[in-house]
A protein has these predicted regions:
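Cytosolic regulatory regions built on CNB/CRP/Popeye-like sensor folds
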Residues: 1-161
Length: 161
């Protein structure tokens, strides 16, 4: 169990009540991954929702540029101290939509996906809070992706003429 005072430090949990934080703390475990370690790939079963205590993680997708060519890893986001990742743990079909690769030694607070979903079903108010926080994460990631896409489209348009 992680101390509630530590959970309060994360933006993901900032709107949670004291009781909700206690419930989250009861599920929380600590986890560490070394620099260079792949945590998961796109399509893997989403086993946990993570909060980054320390370190840096690249969220990436693979882009296939043609047959016979190796896939290109495209960075979608970089997750650092205080941020969250692994929202797929609470959103069907419960598979990660991006890969995760630690670029620093990284310490996490992890919430087991099955236990977390059971808690969300049991406590609807907590489930609502979690989904609000997840929605913010998805919205931010979508905004970052749009900016990247617009930048690439803008460059391709400029170079075509």
């Amino acid at each position: 169990m992680i101390a509630v005072s530590i959970l309060k430090e994360f933006a993901f949990l900032k709107d949670f009540s004291a009781d909700q934080l206690k419930n989250m703390a009861s599920l929380a475990t600590e986890e560490s991954h070394l620099a260079g370690e792949h945590m998961y790939q796109k399509g893997d079963a989403a086993r946990s929702l993570f909060l980054v205590k320390e370190g840096k993680v690249v969220m990436f997708m693979e882009s296939y540029l043609g047959t016979g060519k190796p896939p290109l890893q495209v960075t979608v986001d970089i997750i650092t101290k205080g941020e969250s990742m692994g929202w797929s743990a609470v959103v069907e079909p419960y598979v990660y939509t991006l890969g995760a690769h630690c670029i620093d030694n990284t310490d996490f607070i992890a919430f087991d996906s099955i236990k977390l979903r059971k808690l969300m079903e049991k406590d609807a108010a907590l489930g609502f809070r979690i989904m609000q926080a997840v929605s913010k994460v998805i919205s931010t990631r979508l905004t970052h992706t749009r900016i990247i896409l617009i930048g690439e489209r803008g460059l391709s348009t400029l170079t075509e003429y």
